[in-house]
Design a protein with these regions (language model features):
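N-terminal glycine-/lysine-enriched basic segments
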Residues: 1-141
Length: 141
């Protein structure tokens, strides 16, 4: 059986998936963040305070949505391994970048140009972080 595929329909589905992930994770952000609640079956409720743990608990019925979820989860894990914190912020920033990029694709922009632009932004922001950073020489600092 032949399956109909629409690129714009898939892009809209991806944007909706990213919105759902963003809405689930942003409740845990910051010192006043709220707990997420997951249902594990057998009347088992879990309260989750971390955005990265909440990401691991999410699951979508659509395989394309799960791919996006796993990509964002990998970004949050890498951020946590490097800095020990910031996984929720990484997820939210990545969601916003992906939503913006997908909206540009829907409007007909070239994906290579979007990718090159995001790479330039990453290098620029890395340089700014290094410019404003202060070296630490002692553990007490």
């Amino acid at each position: 059986m032949r399956k109909n595929f629409s690129l714009f329909e898939q892009l809209d589905n991806n944007i909706n998936t990213i919105d759902e992930i963003d809405n689930c994770i942003k409740i845990t952000l910051g010192p006043t963040g709220k707990n997420g609640i997951t249902y594990g079956g057998k009347d088992e409720l879990k309260f989750i305070t971390s955005g990265s743990l909440l990401m691991k608990a999410l699951d979508f019925p659509n395989s394309a949505s799960n791919v996006i979820l796993k990509l964002l989860e990998q970004a949050s894990i890498k951020s946590y391994k490097i800095s020990g914190d910031g996984s929720t912020t990484t997820i939210l920033l990545a969601c916003q970048l992906l939503k913006s990029a997908l909206k540009f694709l829907v409007h007909g922009y070239n994906s290579v140009l979007i990718s090159n632009g995001l790479t330039k932004i990453a290098y620029f922001l890395s340089e700014k972080v290094l410019e404003f950073s202060v070296p630490i020489s002692k553990v007490s600092e």
